[in-house]
């Protein structure tokens, strides 16, 4: 099976996207900048951000000088969703990262103690601001503030005294403005080339938390040397904005006010494209190799694939290419991979090219094949099972999956197809009265006419292993138990 977690092991050819974003961030003239890595659920946004982090780290390692230090901060907004103020929690995370970096590399930073004192002061300010959100009085807040002697040790004393005054008076808007200025001074004095903050899983949060994170980004968006990289489905972000700012669109508006708000905040929208057919075939083939070959062999295959992608961004990298790049003295058994490759054309044709959906589909297929093996169904073909499952995965047509089950159940496991598969290929379309009404859409005709043919195949065992997807059927666990006991 395949893990559903984000990864730096690039099977999608996303390194080119990471390299482009790295080039933008390393251009001093482009900072400060906010980048929106936009894509649908499961499109690989988190993995792209990990690749970008890795790419920037490699650049930093290869440029060991005083102007090459890059601080990268990862903030998962979903994990902090339960916090009272997601915005301030994000700010705290950035300050904690600065603090940790200085303590780790004290020998690199001049006046490290002074920098730490300034960070601690800002951290206290954020803590107090959190309490202000709880409607605590300025008098109560004073006890949390540093003493005057501590303030005097910090450079830029007047600015910090102004911050102190803003907090004690409960002037939160002025506090934010002063905080931004002080934070900018701090980043500059620490000598960073860039401070990069990755905000991930924003689209998993509720609208209130989404707005809180966006407001935190807005706070820093004009601070020199900073870059925010935000991974999200922009449709969900626009929906959150519409819930928070319920503005009525006017007839003369040519764009949504909510998308306008997002455009002001995100200076560079970067949309991940849907995987092409060639990219899907490559991805599925590599996933099969990863699952069915040992780690050493797969790492060799993956490295050759990365080299291939550097010069060819369009072509598929299929099993023939993989075999052609295996050294002659190396004997790798590809049987388990090649046995499953007939599933690729069906998946390319009928799923939507979303990496996470492809992986989850393969995981479900794998579990059902294992179930078939445990149940003693040795004749289950991966391509036939895949063809049935793509209907189950299509929300528009999963009722046809139910219909197929009933049809085969009423006919001893064999669908009464007659000439339906051939009719689906003709201009006249399906004429068989049993199939004509419910199976004449372009998608379903394409499905019926696609390989493999289901004619004369007994599908009882196929639907048995897929019964967890059927309505009003017994739980699959009980079926397995009764079958193997």
Model regions and ranges:
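Switch/connector loops and helix/strand junctions flanking conserved nucleotide-binding motifs
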Residues: 45-46, 82-86, 236-242, 278-282
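Conserved NTP-binding/hydrolysis module of P-loop NTPases
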Residues: 84-101
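Short hydrophobic/aromatic beta-strand immediately N-terminal to the Walker A/P-loop
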Residues: 34-38, 74, 198
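The feature marks long, low-complexity, polar/acidic/proline-rich intrinsically disordered regions embedded
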Residues: 1-15, 19-31, 35, 43, ...
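Conserved P-loop NTPase "ATPase switch" module shared by AAA+ and STAND
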Residues: 192-207
């Amino acid at each position: 099976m395949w893990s559903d977690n984000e990864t730096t092991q690039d099977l999608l050819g996303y390194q080119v996207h990471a390299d482009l974003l790295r080039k933008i961030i390393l251009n001093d003239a482009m900072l400060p900048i906010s980048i929106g890595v936009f894509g649908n659920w499961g499109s690989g946004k988190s993995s792209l951000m990990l690749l970008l982090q890795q790419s920037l780290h490699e650049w930093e390692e290869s440029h060991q000088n005083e102007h090459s230090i890059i601080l990268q901060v990862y903030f998962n907004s979903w994990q902090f969703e339960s916090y009272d103020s997601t915005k301030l929690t994000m700010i705290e995370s950035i300050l904690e990262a600065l603090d940790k970096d200085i303590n780790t590399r004290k020998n690199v930073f001049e006046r490290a103690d002074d920098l730490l004192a300034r960070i601690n002061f800002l951290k206290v300010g954020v803590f107090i601001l959190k309490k202000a959100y709880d409607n605590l009085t300025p008098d109560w807040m004073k006890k949390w503030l540093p003493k005057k002697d501590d303030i005097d040790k910090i450079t830029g004393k007047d600015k910090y005294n102004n911050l102190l005054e803003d907090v004690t008076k409960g002037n939160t808007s002025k506090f934010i403005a002063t905080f931004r200025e002080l934070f900018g001074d701090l980043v500059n004095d620490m000598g960073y080339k860039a401070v990069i903050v990755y905000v991930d899983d924003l689209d998993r949060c509720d609208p209130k938390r989404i707005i809180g994170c966006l407001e935190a980004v807005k706070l820093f968006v004009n601070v020199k040397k900073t870059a925010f990289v935000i991974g999200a489905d922009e449709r969900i972000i626009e929906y959150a904005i519409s819930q928070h700012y319920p503005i009525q669109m006017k007839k003369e508006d040519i764009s949504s006010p909510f998308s306008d708000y997002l455009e002001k905040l995100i200076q560079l929208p970067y949309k991940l494209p849907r995987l092409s057919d060639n990219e899907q075939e490559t991805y599925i083939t590599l996933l099969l190799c990863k699952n069915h070959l040992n780690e050493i062999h797969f790492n060799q295959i993956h490295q050759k694939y990365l080299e291939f992608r550097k010069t060819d961004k369009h072509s598929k990298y299929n099993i023939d290419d993989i075999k052609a790049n295996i050294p002659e003295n190396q004997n790798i058994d590809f049987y388990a991979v090649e046995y499953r490759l007939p599933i690729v054309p069906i998946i390319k044709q009928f799923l939507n090219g979303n990496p996470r959906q492809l992986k989850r589909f393969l995981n479900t297929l794998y579990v059902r094949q294992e179930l078939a093996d445990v149940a003693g169904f040795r004749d289950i073909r991966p391509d036939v099972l895949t063809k049935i499952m793509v209907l189950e995965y299509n929300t528009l047509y999963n009722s046809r999956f139910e219909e197929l089950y009933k049809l085969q159940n009423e006919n001893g496991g064999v669908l009464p197809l007659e000439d339906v598969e051939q009719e689906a290929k003709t201009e006249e379309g399906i004429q068989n009265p049993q199939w004509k009404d419910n199976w004449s859409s372009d998608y379903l005709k394409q499905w019926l006419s696609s390989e493999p043919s289901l004619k004369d195949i007994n599908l009882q065992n196929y639907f048995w292993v897929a019964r967890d997807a059927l309505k009003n059927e017994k739980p699959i666990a009980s079926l397995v138990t009764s079958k193997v006991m």
